[in-house]
Amino acid sequence: MSKSTAEIRQAFLDFFHSKGHQVVASSSLVPHNDPTLLFTNAGMNQFKDVFLGLDKRNYSRATTSQRCVRAGGKHNDLENVGYTARHHTFFEMLGNFSFGDYFKHDAIQFAWELLTSEKWFALPKERLWVTVYESDDEAYEIWEKEVGIPRERIIRIGDNKGAPYASDNFWQMGDTGPCGPCTEIFYDHGDHIWGGPPGSPEEDGDRYIEIWNIVFMQFNRQADGTMEPLPKPSVDTGMGLERIAAVLQHVNSNYDIDLFRTLIQAVAKVTGATDLSNKSLRVIADHIRSCAFLIADGVMPSNENRGYVLRRIIRRAVRHGNMLGAKETFFYKLVGPLIDVMGSAGEDLKRQQAQVEQVLKTEEEQFARTLERGLALLDEELAKLSGDTLDGETAFRLYDTYGFPVDLTADVCRERNIKVDEAGFEAAMEEQRRRAREASGFGADYNAMIRVDSASEFKGYDHLELNGKVTALFVDGKAVDAINAGQEAVVVLDQTPFYAESGGQVGDKGELKGANFSFAVEDTQKYGQAIGHIGKLAAGSLKVGDAVQADVDEARRARIRLNHSATHLMHAALRQVLGTHVSQKGSLVNDKVLRFDFSHNEAMKPEEIRAVEDLVNAQIRRNLPIETNIMDLEAAKAKGAMALFGEKYDERVRVLSMGDFSTELCGGTHASRTGDIGLFRIISESGTAAGVRRIEAVTGEGAIATVHADSDRLSEVAHLLKGDSNNLADKVRSVLERTRQLEKELQQLKEQAAAQESANLSSKAIDVNGVKLLVSELSGVEPKMLRTMVDDLKNQLGSTIIVLATVAEGKVSLIAGVSKDVTDRVKAGELIGMVAQQVGGKGGGRPDMAQAGGTDAAALPAALASVKGWVSAKLQ
């Protein structure tokens, strides 16, 4: 009887423990103190500093069963999971490690003993093949002369990836870090499975499967590509538990091992699925492992970094559950079966079972609200698609509005042989990021570098200019005593009217000046209790201790004040119009625009946007007083003051009230009365992620400018339509009606022309073994008319096979029609596929009708010429 996965895991650890190895527990899936890694993706991650000589352990040999996730960054297997036999988001890596202890000889001998000894895994020796790095003669000789593997089963692999050391047999965790040559062990499943040995053209087949990678850690790769010898040569090995389990349990797919069979049955039970071969069951069985263990290790679903990868995996699983027909939340119900099947490796998960289940349930419920609508939109877009690629804007809209990660959209498209324009998606994402970034040329880098022990007193609520004294100067993050003309620096004063960026409000700009100098302030930031004025000394020199006159850019500050006060009014209005679930998730207030992120699960309707706009403007017309009070935090909360997202508050807080309409904690600068704002207009509403919406708006002169711009556009349209603003709608309706009528007439003419063309074409059909064959390239015919023409020709010709093509804007459109009495011998889908392949495209359809597209118009004549021979062979 074959070993269970749990028994295999334990046997591996027991074997290496018997060889003097310390059994070390799996580390967290979240790498500690390693910014180069998104997730733990190999057994050696927790020993990286040991290999680098930066850390010492009280053992020189170790063995682990390490939990790993590969679903983001360099090692991203997500898109393949469920569609192949061996790709997973989560897997366990069995490993043994030597830290300056044994090296190549013992590492190879240990591996061979474990794999082939009757006491352990007892694999047939003749089924094992090995590879070595091309120049690693030492490893080659150990395998040949000491282990006794025939030369024909030892394969040297060189730099096969286009660069020095870029080889399947030279291992490196990333662009930098520990690396070295490796030897890999492969298992031959037998000649009944297609595939060739490693290094052969057929190596991607499933016959020869890598089961163990033994890395001889000799170097530390630097950022410039140089290889520095490690302090002590070491060994890092990795053997996928799921892969070796498949070998030992005599199955060819990881999803057929006992662990996955149990999980797949559990998935079928909670979703109501009956076909256990359905790939969606495999996807979900894999994904519950990564999701549950990531949450147990502290990762929460979110819209950035690790949290977003987790969210993507959860949503992919939920979508596959939807495909299986799951009628209610199901994913969280798999945590219990997972704990049971993991055995001792699931103890950490068991302790956190309740929390993991709750997080999964909440996330699934949140996504379920938009999944159906998003899938309906995607189905609609795919139905309209004429080519084989979904545009990036649509993919982004699915992400932005419905929370569809692009790989989920790609999954749906993949099932229909459609690609996704991921470059277009990234362009749309980057545009959103661009809008989200505050264009500050200073500040961010300085924040990380500067440490100021002194404090600055902010007096900008009541003053826009005052005298202060320089208490510190920083250039490139380092404290200096003086600066000269042309130098960029951070100037710290004892007191200042400049507002430092905080609570979403940008820092002030302005000037620090004296008798012999002028310092242009481009930004203002906080450094602990100090306020730093960031900019450039335009003239003269400045030193610590100098007196300065600090002048804030008054006009800019005034515009910021209006925008900030309007943000408070809008927040309160959103809660009235949409509901009290609205809470602030972030904001940006500068002199040009205000941006406000808030919790809401769907795009705002036009009437909701108008209602918010009207409500804010009503408060502006009320000319409410804007008042501030300093009070205890608890008293402010009791008063109902709303706190700002992401801010920390002292025990004494500043409470800002706008009449009876809005009360918030706020340290920003504001107008005196709401009437000062003048006018408020919303210019955009969009999503930043599922459950978070973003509004951008303008006030005062900026709002008036948008009114003028709208009026100018209306005037231009009215002029073009020879009307005026009073009858513009009627004019547009008239033009649209005339356009519809002309389009209808044009369509009728096209159909008449197509019918005439069909009549002319029918005479060109030739007889092939009793069947009429018609192949023709048409010019001036719209692709969508081809189907009508094929239907007409089939009616005219009887037993027939038809292939029509047309080229428009460099793209080939193809259609094939086969009369039903011929489809047992010739299928339209196969025929069109043969032609499409020759013109750089693909397609498909029913046996009697199929369509395709292509990009190589020059190849079309030859492709059409090949139809007669292909059809003749089929009709023989």
From Swiss-Prot:
SUPFAM superfamilies: Class II aaRS and biotin synthetases, Putative anticodon-binding domain of alanyl-tRNA synthetase (AlaRS), ThrRS/AlaRS common domain, Translation proteins. Its cofactor is Zn(2+). Keywords: Acetylation, Aminoacyl-tRNA synthetase, ATP-binding, Cytoplasm, Ligase, Metal-binding, Nucleotide-binding, Protein biosynthesis, RNA-binding, tRNA-binding, Zinc. Binds 1 zinc ion per subunit. SMART domains: tRNA_SAD (SM00863). Belongs to the class-II aminoacyl-tRNA synthetase family. NCBIfam families: alaS. Catalyzes the attachment of alanine to tRNA(Ala) in a two-step reaction: alanine is first activated by ATP to form Ala-AMP and then transferred to the acceptor end of tRNA(Ala). Also edits incorrectly charged Ser-tRNA(Ala) and Gly-tRNA(Ala) via its editing domain. It comes from the Bacteria. GO terms for cellular component: cytosol. It is an enzyme of class 6 (ligase). Homotetramer. The modification N6-acetyllysine is found at K74. Its main location: cytoplasm. This is Alanine--tRNA ligase. Consists of three domains; the N-terminal catalytic domain, the editing domain and the C-terminal C-Ala domain. The editing domain removes incorrectly charged amino acids, while the C-Ala domain, along with tRNA(Ala), serves as a bridge to cooperatively bring together the editing and aminoacylation centers thus stimulating deacylation of misacylated tRNAs.
